[in-house]
Amino acid sequence: MIARIQFIKGIDEKVLPDVRLTRSRDGSTGTATFLFKNANLINKSLALNGEITGMYMIDEEGILETRDVSARFVNGKPQAVESIYIMKSPEAWDRFMRFMERYGESNGLAFTKA
């Protein structure tokens, strides 16, 4: 199964995000901030296909989801979609990193430390 991201269930997001990760010093919690510039779901015709209820990260292990999704507007027009995924345990961090490894392999993304 190919790792993928959806905002509308059943419709894969084709735009690749910029992802920023932060983690607490003790490793117990972390945050992933996704920024999708000109995301598919901004397209009005696609938005008519369903309701945006969150961001769903789907792979062979299952689904990770967040409801923290917002749009960025410039001059009254949507330009980007931002989503924040919070990991509340080391196990959740490890699961997220496994998803991102699969998503990166599927889409030619690379991980670089700041």
UniProtKB/Swiss-Prot annotation:
Entry's Gene Ontology BP terms: photosynthesis
UniProt cross-references to InterPro entries, sorted A to Z: Psb28_c1_sf, PSII_Psb28_class-1
Keywords: Chloroplast, Membrane, Photosynthesis, Photosystem II, Plastid, Thylakoid
One GO cellular component term noted in the UniProt record for this chain: photosystem II
Membrane topology field: Peripheral membrane protein
Compartmental location: Plastid, Chloroplast thylakoid membrane
Self-association state and partner proteins as the record states: Part of the photosystem II complex.
Protein's name according to its UniProt entry: Photosystem II reaction center Psb28 protein
